[in-house]
Amino acid sequence: MIGDLLKGFNASFGDLLTSTEAGQGTIKDNMDDLCDILEDEILKSKASEDEKKALLKKLRTFCNTETNIMLVGATGCGKSSTINALFAVSEECKDIEEEEYLEEDQPQKTYVEIAKVGSKADPETKDIEKYRIGNLILWDTPGLGDGTEIDEHHKEVITELLRKEDEEGKALIDLVLVILDGSTKDLGTSYKILNDVIIPELKNDTSRILVALNQADIAMKTGRHWDYEKNEPDEILIQFLEEKVQSIKNRIKEDSDLDISPVYYCAGYMEESGDVVHPYNLSKLLYYIMQSLPAQKRVAIMEGINTDSDHYEYNDEEENYNEEIKDSFYDSFDYISDGVDTGVEVGGTILGIPGAIIGGFLGGFVGCIKSILDSIF
């Protein structure tokens, strides 16, 4: 299968091929080229016309599918810092009207717009901010907990967005990332939106809900217990965080009878003293996001990630999350051939025949993608 081949591919050999048409570029640049080449390989293959149609349909779905993630949380929980830590949302992002960037001749760049969700929106209340990074779309909902009336408005726009459908009549939002403030005991507002809106609207589908506890570094009020040199919690803080995560899980179970396991992390920031707290467990959070999404939805995530390798350096040691992230991405390629019953060779890869991929432009682009990912993770 393609995923296994990508994992075993010799990236350094692929780099030798980049002197032709395959440049270093970005993950998205190389993915676009790789998709074009795979399409050409399918068309040139000895597969039947029906098999070609099936493969092409899945390939185009895989390469062009948008992924929509909604972020929900109380004011001050760190939604914006999480977005900036995880994804390539730069200060150069500009406001742009939706119809402008949907024109075919407009390049797929990173844009931010104010999404007018909710016809009864009060001009004094905040609207949902919508970030587009290629095929990745992030919906940053307004912070909760600033007053009953304002929260009711926010609940309405969140509900409306959760009910939106895509062109195929499927739910628009693929994943709801609920961010909790690890520095406070008062999580009532977040529990309320989770139990009153998110869980009911998603019809108890826990695969589309991810709960994350941010600001893990300041979770304890009695001393920081944060090792600045190692950029990690000490044993006392780890135990506290594990107990807090278990408490949150128990509370959600008690309220909804659903099993949702939160992940704790720190999005990173600079203190007034100049001390830098780098992101911690960001790779773990990204891995959980990848695993929560269907295979064909993961490409957009990788195309939109923040490529600063420092963000993924510090994690707990429960798993090698960086390798798991890459494997999850490579495994997603198997979506193209899953369910297509054919025995012919397509690009030397799609049906598990690894011969042709180590030659020609295809190998170069695969090598580029692997090299880029290896430099990040």
Residue ranges and their predicted role:
Residues 2-141, 146:
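Conserved G1/Walker A P-loop phosphate-binding module
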Residues 145-149, 185-188, 220-221, 271-275:
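A generic structural signal for short coil/turn motifs at secondary-structure boundaries
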Residues 97-101, 105-112, 154-155, 225-236:
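Short, flexible helix-coil linker/hinge segments at the edges of structured domains or between repeats
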Residues 210, 219-354, 358-361, 365:
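C-terminal end of P-loop GTPase domains and the immediately downstream helical coupling element
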Residues 73-75, 139-144, 178-181, 211-224, ...:
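Short loop/turn segments at strand-loop or loop-helix junctions that form parts
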Residues 156-258:
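Conserved C-terminal guanine-recognition region of P-loop GTPase G domains, centered on the G4
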Residues 143-152, 233-234:
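Flexible beta-alpha connector loops of hexameric P-loop NTPases
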Residues 29, 362-377:
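Membrane-engaging insertion elements
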